[in-house]
Every structure is written in C-alpha cells, then in structure tokens.
Amino acid sequence: MKKLKVVHYINNFFAGVGGEEKANIPPEMREGAVGPGMALAAALGDEAEVVATVICGDSYYGENMDSARKEILEMIKDAQPDAFVAGPAFNAGRYGVACGSIAKAVEEDLGIPSVTGMYVENPGVDMYRKDIQIIETGNSAADLRNSMPKLAKLVMKKAKGELVGPPEVEGYHMMGIRTNFFHEKRGSERAIDMLVNKLNGEKFETEYPMPVFDRVPPNPAVKDMSKVKVAIVTSGGIVPHDNPDRIESSSATRYGIYDITGMDSMSADDFTSIHGGYDRAFVVKDPNLVVPLDVMRDLEREGVIGELANYFVSTTGTGTSVGNAKGFGESFSKKLIEDGVGAVILTSTUGTCTRCGATMVKEIERAGIPVVHLATVVPISLTIGANRIVPAIGIPHPLGDPALDAKGDKKLRRELVMRGLKALQTEVDEQTVFEG
C-alpha cells in the first residue's frame, strides 16, 4: 500500500534556525522531516511519511500574515500532500496564530485534511477552534512525546476519511459543533440521571456546555484630552536595569510601577527589557520603542494631553497566564483611578504578550478608564476583546522603525501615539481597529 504524504509546518525555533534574532525569516520549504517532524514521522508509522517541512519565522508571519499565508499555501500545494500538520505550538502565541491560520487555509482553500496542536491558553485556540481541530497539548515542548501521537492519529483519520470522534475522545479543543447520533438512553432518562447526580453532589457532565463570553463594553470617549492625565502601561517587559521587582522574563507572576518624574525620554542607561518573547536588541538600545516617553513628554508640553502620569506600569506578557494578567489589570487599575488617570495607552509586543496586554486592557476598561491597545498582532487583541486597537509597526519594535534615522523614527512614533489619542477621543460601540 502506498504511503500517504504529509507536509509539516514549524517555526524557526523548532527548525533549529535560531532564536528571536531569526524570527523574521521568510517561508522556506525543506525536503523530509525537520526537528519535531522526526517525532511526527515516528508517530505516523508505516502508513504515511513526512515528505516536506515548511519553515517560517514567527515574527515574519505575524507581521505579514496575508502574504506569508499565500506563499506557504503555494509551497504546500506544490508538494501535493494527502494531509497537513502544523506545530504543535504549545503556549507560543505567535506560533499558535500561524499554525491555526495556515491549517485553516490548507483545509479550506486546498481541501487537504489538516490538524494542529496548542495549549489551552494559546490565543490561537480561541481564534481558530471553530475552524480546525486543535489537539490539546501541555504548555511547553516537554509535552511533545504525548501530543505528537495524538496529532498523527487524528490527521490520519481525516486523511483516510474515517469518522472523527468528539473532543473528549480524540483530544482536541471543543469546537462548538453539535452532531446528532443515536444514544442508548433517551433524553428524558439522561436528564433525570444528571439531576440525581447533581442533587447528590456527584460528578455530572452537561450535554450542552454554554459558551463563556468575557467582553467589556467600551468606555465613553475622552472629551478633551488636553485636560486629562494619561498613563502608559506595557506588557513589553521594560524595567530598570536592576529589575527591582524581579519580574520573570516569561510567565510573569508580578508587575512593576516605575518612576519617570523629570525624564524626557526612556534612556538605555536607566531602562532595559527583560522580555523573553521577542528580539530585544532594538529596545535595549531605545526603550522608547515600547514605552513612548519621548513623544508623550512633547505632547504634554504642547498641551495636547493634560498631564502624563509620573510612572509607567510594566510586566512581561510572554507566556503569562490569562489569570495573572487579569489580576495585574485589576490591581494597578485601582492605583490609576486613585491618581486621577483618565486615559491609558497600553503597548504589547509578541503573541502571548498581546494576549496579556489585551487582557489587562479589558480590566482597565472594566475599571472605567478609556484605554487603547497598540499592538502588532491585531487578530489576538481582537480575539481577547480589546475595544480600541491601533496596529503597531513590528513585534520587536512596536512604536518605531530602527531602520529610520532618529528623527524619522520619532516622527513615526508620534504618528502612532497620536492615532492612539484619536482612538481614545472617538466614540465606539464595538471593537474598532484604527488603521490610520
């Protein structure tokens, strides 16, 4: 029997190409299995083989989603596979978005059975769970030996046209799809059994789980920005050099509040980035790329804003749990209110950093303060529920372009901040992306 052909998608990290400094590499295709593709090949056994591996940098895909997806689809189409596997991405946000986006497109546009895998808190799960089967994984690559056989088993079922079972059987995240089938007990009996178990305090499982929506209505627009105190919050990991609060480089459990009284710019002598989710080279040289103090001071002097808070709030968003991010936002929002802050600009960098940032945005909004989210990976911000969003420039430099000279870079940063201020002064009744 002829072996089925499988194409595998991985990012630059898993391909062994490099770390964050190589996260901007464009798509390429290699023959055979690469990196975790070896585990996929082993799990497929004698029925299928990995004929090619597509590799792309996470930042490149995140910043060029439409064109990168189109290029990758052409590569996959040329390989003529019978099935496609992306990842697994575990809890890597940018990687998860890429895996979900590509797997969805391969199945819908090319008609090739596809699967991917992610940790439950990966933002890619909520973005693509209704479109594609996403195998539940652990939060790191340590789970590869457990998750890859599940991906292989499911994609082979799909490739051979076999019936795919429910999430609890196959191990994928719930898709919100209901299927009719014959049960050995009629509905009334099952309902009575469920009620009896509930009354007795015993375990029971609903047959119709209700979706949970956590959306916060947008606050009214700022009427007169020239009379309002504005604060800067970031999930981009900017801290003083000694990192006094010992904020972790990933999966943060705390945040910090740092004084900027009398400062006209974020100096590399005073601040650095401890963030583990993007290439910090640009930001270490110029922290204004994440915390736009230089531009905000100019706007304060010009009377565009009433006042800039004499501190900024910072944490590391990469890998940080939704629960922790929510707790951070609830906590520091109380201080913002006590200090009379009337508007917030929140900046984010990578994928899970954007998830963390958008989660904090919702808590700031819930506290009654208008807030705008400046982030490059806009789809994640939308999925999590930010209401006012301004697309940023790039994952490792959201508020500027290091390729420009200092004057041009600052001009670009000012344009972004002004767009953010415009968003804060615009009435919205639904999620709105302010493109410019």
Swiss-Prot record:
Keyword check for Metal-binding: no
Catalytic activity: acetyl phosphate + methylamine + [thioredoxin]-disulfide + H2O = sarcosine + [thioredoxin]-dithiol + phosphate + H(+)
EC number(s) stated in the UniProt entry for this protein: 1.21.4.3
GO molecular function, one term: glycine reductase activity
Keyword Oxidoreductase: yes
A GO CC annotation given for this chain: glycine reductase complex
Coiled coil: none
Top-level class of the enzyme under EC nomenclature: oxidoreductase
Summary of subunit composition and partner proteins: Heterotetramer of two alpha and two beta subunits. Component of the sarcosine reductase complex, together with components A and C. PB is substrate specific.
Record-stated family: Belongs to the GrdB/GrdF/GrdH family.
Name of the molecule in the record: Sarcosine reductase complex component B subunit beta
Lineage, top ranks: Bacteria, Bacillati, Bacillota, Clostridia, Peptostreptococcales
Gene expressing this chain: grdF
